[in-house]
Design a protein with these regions (language model features):
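Short acidic/glycine- and proline-prone juxtamembrane loop motifs at membrane-interface regions
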Residues: 35, 245-252
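Hydrophobic alpha-helical membrane-interfacial segments at the cytosolic entry of transmembrane helices
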Residues: 67-71, 279-286, 311-337, 445-453, ...
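Membrane-lumen/periplasm interface segments of multi-pass, membrane-embedded glycan/lipid transferases
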Residues: 337-434
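Perimembrane helix-loop-helix junctions
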Residues: 262-271, 297-329
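Transmembrane-helix signature of polytopic, membrane-embedded enzymes
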Residues: 9-16, 63, 195-198, 217-237
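Interfacial juxtamembrane loops and adjacent helix segments
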Residues: 104-201
């Protein structure tokens, strides 16, 4: 029996407290940076408790996820640069979240004026505007250094005391607005507590993180197996990074993940007919998630292939299909309605409106006319774009370990390989007999077709409203958009049942275990042990390499 197993619970907790307090005192006396001190104060107790509770955490993916996501997420929120544009369109998300928290007439500060500006980094960064031909990258590379954080935080704290009221008539509730509610809750709480600017900003990030953790945890509870797939997705560096910032992507991906998991959970219980509650667990999260990026609605095609055996009667299945169609039409109208009401004129993507220069010619109506005049030409443009979008190198480089404008961490290729191996291990091995039989050919093909269409429709939208008229390319489709349907691919499309688990254990884990010392062989052949060890390692590597070692 391991020595830690014989210790009482109070003693284990007492040792964890000591592992937090003693390093804090020692590192403070040595004058270490606060980030280094905070990392060890959190990491050492967590590492000790992980060892003490390893059997419980290994056998429960839900607990393992919470045990890893909460401390690493909190550290990421604390280490994040103050400027909100560190994440994709963070300045837009922050302003809307502020307006939700305070209303149309809201109190703003001089610091907010910086955070509302896409180029605010030049105000708080180390390199002034115009210093060189490329002063954007050096500013982001230096923002996490000790000097960079000290200057930025000092500037924000100084300007955060300068307040004035603003009436912004441009704010209006829309379908995408709700995606900023988690951030807004933290800002509202900061106002309620009278928190200083930097703390208020932290609270907005914290509530978004907690909302993401809640959605991922709920998704795991809906499944009989495949929970480790969801755990690995929930701890992907790019997704946790967005959850710790001002972004509506955690809302979108999180609700879609919950909808997908609920759907797969129903398939894993073929003996239980679909109930009203079960249907709502699928349709409500899916709708809330896809509303944020409505052009991705074709990806819901898989919903129509829920097998007849899940319904008590044929009429019940007809009602299910009608409900899915109503959801699809409603979501489609949220982006097609405004476009059609303008007669197809102007821009269909608001980001296109910022591209106003002599070299830019963006007009949806004119673009649509050219597409109708020569549809085969546009079809070729779409095919070429889609093939390029599936280029493995950008996917490897940007989909797993990406912190937006921050410079790439050291060893990021090796780190990315680790994330891919973890996802592959969970996808192939976290399968039970509950996964055998239900992935019918029709369901799998329907899901694949829906996913392909869900990326073609946004591409068409971006061609209409974000790309020059008559261009032979499509702008605006980012690799990170693949995260929307990545959970569906791993949970459903790539489900081979227990066959894949048996193959990996026989051909991969078994041979690896034979090369290890005898005492380690049982753990090396156990999926739960291998997954928990690799997931824990990658979660803490995310903080160490992402925010400490490279500086």
């Amino acid at each position: 029996m391991p020595r830690s197993a014989s210790l009482t619970a109070p003693l284990k907790v007492g040792i964890a407290v000591a592992l937090a307090v003693i390093p804090a005192l020692v590192l403070a006396l040595l004058g270490c940076q606060w980030r280094v001190t905070l990392f060890w104060v959190v990491f050492l107790p967590c590492a000790w408790l992980l060892w003490c509770w390893r059997r419980t955490l290994m056998e429960s993916p839900e607990r393992l996820f919470l045990f890893l996501a909460l401390p690493t997420g909190l550290l990421m929120c604390a280490f994040m640069p103050t400027i909100v544009s560190v994440s994709w369109d963070g300045y837009v998300h922050y302003k809307v979240a502020n307006q939700i928290a305070q209303g149309e007439i809201f109190v703003t500060t001089g610091a907010d004026a910086i955070n509302y500006d896409m180029d605010g980094i030049y105000v708080v960064g180390l390199v002034p505007w115009g210093t060189s031909d490329n002063d954007w990258d050096p500013n982001w590379q230096g923002i996490l250094t000790e000097d960079g954080m000290e200057k930025a935080n000092g500037r924000f704290a100084e300007l955060g005391d300068v307040t004035y009221k603003v009436s912004d008539g441009s704010f209006a509730w829309g379908v995408t607005t709700m995606g900023r509610i988690p951030n807004a809750l933290g800002l509202w709480l900061g106002d309620l507590l009278g928190a200083p600017y930097l703390l208020r900003l932290f609270l907005g990030r914290l509530t978004n993180l907690l909302f993401w953790i809640l959605l991922v945890w709920l998704a795991m509870t809906r499944l009989k197996s495949g929970k480790r797939i969801v755990c690995a997705i929930g701890l992907l560096p790019i997704l946790l990074f967005e959850a710790c910032n001002y972004s509506y992507d955690p809302w979108c991906v999180g609700f879609l993940l919950l909808g997908f998991a609920s759907f797969v959970g129903e398939l894993q219980r073929p003996e239980k007919p679909l109930t009203l509650g079960g249907a709502l667990w699928i349709l409500v999260p899916f709708t809330l998630g896809v509303l944020i990026k409505a052009a991705w609605i074709p990806g819901g095609l898989f919903l129509l292939f829920l097998p007849q055996k899940k319904f008590r009667t044929r009429g019940a299945r007809v009602l299910w299909i009608l409900a899915c169609v109503v959801v699809a039409l409603g979501v489609t109208w949220t982006f097609m309605g405004p476009f059609l009401s303008r007669g197809g004129s102007g821009y269909s993507d608001s980001r296109g409106e910022t591209l106003t220069s002599a070299t830019v010619n963006i007009d949806s109506a004119e673009q649509l006319a050219q597409m109708a005049e020569n549809p085969l030409r546009f079809l070729w443009v779409l095919v070429v774009w889609f093939v390029g979008y599936l280029n493995p190198w950008p996917i490897f480089e940007q989909l797993f370990v990406s912190f937006c404008y921050l410079s790439r961490p050291v060893l990021w290729p090796l780190w990315t390989v680790g994330e891919i191996v973890l996802l592959a291990l969970a996808t192939s091995c976290d399968r039970t007999q509950a996964d055998d039989g239900w992935p019918s050919r029709a369901l799998r093909i329907g899901a694949i077709v829906g996913i392909v269409l869900s990326y073609c429709l946004p591409a068409i939208s971006l061609y209409l409203g974000y790309t020059n008229v008559g261009a032979d390319y499509i702008l605006g489709m980012q690799v990170r958009y693949m995260l929307l349907y990545l959970p569906l691919v791993l949970l459903l499309v790539l489900n081979l049942g227990t066959r894949s688990r048996a193959w990996v254990q026989r051909r991969v884990l078994g041979p690896v275990a034979e090369r290890l010392p005898e005492r380690w062989r049982p753990a090396a052949q156990n999926l739960a042990d291998v997954f928990a060890a690799l997931q824990s390692l990658l979660a803490w590597v995310m903080i160490a390499l992402g925010f400490l070692v490279r500086f």
